Amino acid sequence: MKKLCYFINSDWYFDLHWTDRAIAARDAGYEIHIISHFVDDKIAEKFRTLGFVYHNIPLVAQSFNVLIFFRAFSKARKIIQNINPDLLHCITIKPCLIGGFLAKSTHRPVILSFVGLGRVFSAESACLKLLRSFTVMAYKYIASNKCSLFMFEHDKDRAKLADLVGIDYKQTIVIDGAG
C-alpha cells in the first residue's frame, strides 16, 4: 500500500480543512499519516477512527524559537524515515521548510502547500527580514528537488515566492483555497 504523509503545524487546521482530502486519498488506497502538533485528544481519536496514523511533534506555529524548530526538525526526520512515505505533503511554512528540506535530501516527492506566505514575507522588521533571507535560501535548496511541487491558493503568493526564490513555474500550481 502506498503511503501519503501530511505534515502540518496544527491538528485543528488539518481537521477543519484537510480531513476530506485525506479520506479521499485513503479511499483511493493510500495509508494516511499525519505529522502535527496534536493538542486536542478528540481530533487525534477522530483521525485514529478514520484509520489515519498520527504522529505528534513539538512544533509551535507562532514561535521563532530556533531550539524548538530544530527539535521539531530532528523529530520529523525520524518520523519520516520510519514512515518512508511515497509522497510527503507539507502544509504551512514551518512544515514546508522542514519537510521540503528532508524531501530534497532523500530525493522524495513532496508537495509544499502555502495557504499564505505569512509574516516572514510581509513584515518589515529587521529580524523578520533576516529570517526571510534564510527562508528564501532554504526554498532555493528545496526547489532544486525536481520532485517538488509548490502549491498556492493565490496567484499573488505564487508570483512573489517564485520571483524571490527562482522557482520554475512548472513546479507550481494555484488551486482554490482549502477553506
Label each PLM-derived region with a short phrase.
Residues H55, V136-G179:
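Donor nucleotide-sugar binding/catalytic pocket of nucleotide-sugar-dependent glycosyltransferases
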Residues C90-C96, F114:
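Short His-centered aromatic/hydrophobic patch
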Residues Y6-L67, D157, T172:
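N-terminal strand-loop element at the rim of the active site
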Residues N9-F14, V60-F64, R108-K129, I142:
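A short, histidine- and acid-enriched strand-loop-helix "catalytic/donor-clamping" loop
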Residues P58-L87, L97-F101, S105, S133-Y141:
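An amphipathic, basic-hydrophobic alpha-helix
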Residues I23-A28, S74-R77, L130-F150:
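Membrane-proximal helix-turn-helix segments that form the acceptor-binding/catalytic region
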Residues K3-C5, A103-F121, M151, I173:
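Active-site proximal beta-strand in glycosyltransferases
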